[in-house]
């Protein structure tokens, strides 16, 4: 394999098994080794997943591959042994570490990840062939899930038995340890007693001892005293305290209404305290009503704002807008060669645009393969990036010509294309129009419909001709 741009573009070319090595010019640094490892693993695992027969370009005639207990030599034998892996493989790489070797200026790469949800460990030894050229000297692949299963079974067996094979412990000495642990367990509940008095009272109520009953009796009269102190300070402020006895002198109280004569008897015992409480309740009721009415208004507004239908609609609008900003149209690809399918071209586009950012989808319509003998037709594709930063990086790498069209250098072996392709942001199109290399326009929601028949009235030729002419604008 080969790195062509001072380890910055992460592009590596295989050497097809040519093992004639030359002396290196400069030693590798740790950062350079990590860049070599990242670029190699990106191309290697994509090739294993999509075109497994093409991995011969990474190995030489004397390269070795270790798969568990099997060892093979040579690129052809390595491909046969790689076929033991499942046909549909999904690699998920968790860690890639690259280290320079102390001799031959090689690179050691350790990879940890999962293939079809099964954890594995793979190590590569890259040998240097000339300046900035590498090939795989040795490759070791090993599943690691079986080792963890064996260790867990051993731990279970050791934990179930003691030192002398007894479950209770060694020589029955565990009884002492249980005694020593008891005072520690009793000392733990002590700190919660320093918490607030409300929590302490709740715990005391749960206990049925007579001491707890005495504590409750001693603490209960303190609460009304604390509650009565602030009313005594606020009592001088309101003056209508003297008016309440006049209000209570109704005809029912003067004549005598049987059970209604009890309130004046209760006032004789503690009229001062009860009058203060009644005046406070009388003044607090209107303020309580105002607070409740004021609290209902923001709650109603919050319920309207947090309605599920509104949130769903806002989420859909934001997701649609975000998706449109992440779509790119790639066109202007001349067809020197027409492949049998679009899979190879889509995979090549993924490899080229991966350096700009993560790719969510690459879609090439089937009709780009029509009329293979007609070289005037161009191929095109639709690319969806994972985030907006990737789209921005693509347009920063492109250049704009005199006509305002963005051009991006591109090489696609599937179509034999090596030149500048056109790129533009993909937007929603009106019903009559189409996306043709940036031609056409975006029809906003609620806007006027283009008519060929004039400024007013129906279009010429009826509605049918009007829809046909809409795509020609």
UniProtKB/Swiss-Prot annotation:
Gene Ontology CC entries for this record: cytoplasmic stress granule; cytosol
Q: Name the Pfam families for this protein.
A: NTF2 (PF02136), RRM_1 (PF00076)
State the name under which the record lists this protein.
Answer: Ras GTPase-activating protein-binding protein gtbp-1
Name the UniProt key words of this record, in alphabetical order: Cytoplasm, Phosphoprotein, RNA-binding, Stress response
Biological processes per GO annotation? stress granule assembly
Null allele phenotype: Shorter lifespan at both 20 and 25 degrees Celsius and lower survival rates following heat or oxidative stress. Increased brood size. Does not suppress heterochronic phenotypes in lin-4(ma161) background animals. Reduction in the number and intensity of pqn-59 stress granules in embryos but does not affect granules formed by tiar-1. In another study, RNAi-mediated knockdown results in reduced formation of tiar-1-positive stress granules in response to heat shock or starvation.
Give the compositionally biased regions (Polar residues): 300-320
Is the keyword Transmembrane in the record? no
Q: In what residue span(s) does the RRM domain sit?
A: 326-420
Q: Where is the composition biased (Low complexity)?
A: 221-249, 261-296
Residue span(s) of domain NTF2: 36-143
What does its PTM field state?
Phosphorylated.
Q: What does this protein do?
A: Plays a role in, but not strictly required for, the formation of stress granules during heat, oxidative stress and starvation. Does not play a role in temporal patterning during worm development.
Locations listed in the record: Cytoplasm, Stress granule; Cytoplasm
Tagged with keyword RNA-binding? yes
Residue spans with biased composition (Gly residues)? 431-444, 453-464
- Bias (Basic and acidic residues): 173-187, 198-218
Q: What is its main location?
A: cytoplasm
Gene Ontology terms, MF aspect? mRNA binding
Annotated region (Disordered), positions in chain = 155-320, 424-473
Q: Which CDD domains match?
A: NTF2
């Amino acid at each position: 394999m080969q790195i062509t741009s001072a380890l910055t573009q992460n592009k590596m070319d295989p050497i097809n098994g040519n093992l004639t090595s030359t002396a290196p010019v400069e030693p590798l640094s740790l950062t350079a080794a990590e860049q070599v490892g990242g670029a190699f693993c990106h191309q290697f695992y994509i090739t294993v997943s999509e075109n497994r027969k093409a991995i011969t370009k990474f190995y030489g005639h004397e390269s070795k591959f270790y798969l568990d207990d099997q060892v093979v030599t040579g690129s052809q034998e390595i491909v046969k042994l790689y076929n033991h892996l499942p046909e549909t493989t999904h690699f998920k790489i968790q860690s890639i570490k690259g280290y320079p070797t102390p001799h031959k200026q090689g690179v050691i790469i350790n990879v940890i990840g999962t293939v079809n949800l099964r954890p594995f460990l793979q190590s590569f030894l890259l040998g240097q062939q000339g300046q900035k050229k590498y090939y795989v000297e040795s490759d070791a692949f090993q599943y690691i899930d079986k080792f963890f299963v064996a260790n867990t079974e051993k731990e279970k067996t050791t934990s179930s038995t003691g030192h002398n094979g007894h479950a209770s412990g060694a020589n029955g000495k565990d009884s002492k340890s249980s005694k020593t642990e008891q005072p520690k367990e009793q000392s733990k509940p002590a700190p919660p007693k320093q918490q607030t008095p409300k929590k302490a009272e709740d715990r005391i109520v749960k206990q049925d001892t007579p001491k707890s009953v005495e504590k409750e009796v001693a603490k209960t009269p303190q609460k009304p005293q604390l509650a009565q102190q602030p009313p005594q300070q606020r009592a001088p402020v309101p003056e209508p305290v003297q008016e309440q006895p006049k209000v209570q002198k109704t005809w029912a109280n003067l004549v005598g209404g049987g059970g209604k004569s009890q309130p004046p008897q209760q006032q004789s015992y503690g009229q001062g305290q009860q009058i203060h409480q009644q005046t406070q309740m009388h003044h607090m009721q209107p303020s309580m009503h105002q607070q409740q009415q004021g609290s209902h208004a923001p709650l109603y507004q919050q319920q309207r704002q947090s309605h599920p239908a509104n949130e769903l609609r806002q989420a859909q609008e934001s997701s649609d807008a975000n998706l449109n900003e992440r779509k790119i149209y790639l066109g202007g690809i001349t067809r020197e060669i027409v492949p049998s399918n679009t899979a190879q071209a889509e995979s090549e586009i993924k490899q080229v645009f991966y350096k700009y950012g993560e790719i969510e989808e690459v879609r090439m319509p089937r009709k780009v393969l029509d009329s293979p003998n007609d070289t005037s037709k161009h191929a095109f594709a639709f690319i969806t990036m994972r985030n907006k930063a990737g789209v921005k990086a693509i347009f920063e790498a492109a250049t704009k010509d005199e006509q305002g069209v963005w051009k991006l250098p591109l090489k696609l072996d599937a179509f034999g294309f090596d030149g500048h392709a056109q790129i533009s942001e993909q937007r929603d199109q009106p019903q009559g129009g189409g996306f043709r290399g940036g031609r056409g326009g975006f029809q906003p929601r609620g806007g006027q419909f283009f008519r060929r028949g004039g400024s007013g009235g129906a279009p010429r030729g009826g509605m049918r001709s009007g829809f046909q002419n809409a795509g020609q604008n």
